Amino acid sequence: MIAVDAWKPADGLTLEPNALRAAKERELSLALTAGPGAGKTEMLAQRADFLLRTGTCRYPKRILAISFKVDASSNLKERVKRRCGSELASRFDSYTFHAFAKRIIDRFRPVLTGEYALDVGYKIADR
């Protein structure tokens, strides 16, 4: 674990001042909006690196990132792993909305009864 003041963006990256402040924010939730290719994924990876390596996100707490697309989800997970290592990255979960919803259904499927009951090998139908 490193001190909050000692944290610097991984991979020798230099973040512009507003991005650096956002990456190091410890009290507020943030909304990050920008166009394609503006660096949103990298910003999220750096923020996760900060939260995990400084202990701001203390064990056993985890970080959840939800994306629309599979490639965005896996890209973000891989970036976090490269920045803070496998051990800390194991506390970073990155899913698509559909994959996250399926995890919830799988976890609570045994308690669904009546018309909501699902078989063990249930399938999700296409549209």
Task: Show where each model-derived region lies.
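P-loop NTPase Walker
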Residues: 1-115
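Coupling/switch/interface segments within P-loop NTPase motor domains and analogous charged loops
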Residues: 117-127
